[in-house]
């Protein structure tokens, strides 16, 4: 009988610690010390939320930098999510998979071998908000032409927004870069 009582007490203590006190402590720490990150790292522009630093978006306008391809087509629409059931994830296809090869060829624009790997392949999450600096620099002439500004102004903006990778290539956040483009004076 003593063993059962001890087991029940230990179970209740564990449930209170792990189910209430620990989550409460972590939530409080997040809200006090990491408020921006704990609430989605949302980016505001012109007094409205335009996205998150953590989630990529699909860009098609030639005046903007384009992010990485998404294996889930940046599926953040609740109605699409209900139909498709997938909101993030990689393709999980092998290098020899014909669908993957066709998709990479499509992103490479029919045989242009002068493209960075992140411009042709999706990330593991399918929602990567960053591109490499090399990818951004290759897009700079297109953006400069579309905005009627010099390529050097666009490359200066890229260099200013560059984040250093520790074990990876240097990268830039596409949404922040595109907002900075819109804020530029022509």
Swiss-Prot record:
Keywords: ATP-binding, Cell membrane, Ion transport, Membrane, Nucleotide-binding, Potassium, Potassium transport, Transmembrane, Transmembrane helix, Transport. Pfam families: KdpC. It comes from the Bacteria. The keyword Membrane applies. GO terms for molecular function: ATP binding; P-type potassium transmembrane transporter activity. Its main location: membrane. The chain crosses the membrane at residues 10-30. It is found in: Cell membrane. GO terms for cellular component: plasma membrane. It is a single-pass membrane protein. The system is composed of three essential subunits: KdpA, KdpB and KdpC. Part of the high-affinity ATP-driven potassium transport (or Kdp) system, which catalyzes the hydrolysis of ATP coupled with the electrogenic transport of potassium into the cytoplasm. This subunit acts as a catalytic chaperone that increases the ATP-binding affinity of the ATP-hydrolyzing subunit KdpB by the formation of a transient KdpB/KdpC/ATP ternary complex. Belongs to the KdpC family. This is Potassium-transporting ATPase KdpC subunit.
């Amino acid at each position: 009988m003593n063993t059962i009582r001890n087991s029940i007490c230990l179970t209740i203590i564990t449930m209170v610690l792990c189910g209430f006190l620990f989550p409460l402590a972590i939530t409080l720490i997040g809200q006090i010390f990491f408020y921006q990150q704990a609430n989605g790292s949302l980016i505001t522009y012109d007094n409205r939320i335009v996205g998150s630093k953590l989630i990529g978006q699909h860009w098609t306008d030639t005046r903007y930098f384009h992010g990485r391809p998404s294996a889930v087509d940046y599926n953040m629409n609740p109605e699409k999510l209900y139909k498709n059931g997938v909101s993030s994830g990689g393709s999980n296809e092998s290098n020899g998979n014909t669908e993957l090869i066709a998709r990479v060829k499509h992103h490479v624009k029919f045989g242009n071998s002068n493209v960075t790997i992140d411009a042709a392949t999706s990330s593991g999450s399918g929602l990567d908000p960053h591109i490499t600096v090399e990818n951004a620099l290759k897009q700079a002439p297109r953006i400069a032409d579309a905005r009627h500004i010099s390529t050097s102004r666009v490359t200066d903006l890229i260099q200013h927004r560059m984040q250093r990778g520790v074990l990876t290539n240097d990268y830039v956040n596409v949404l922040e870069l595109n907002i900075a483009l819109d804020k530029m004076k022509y």
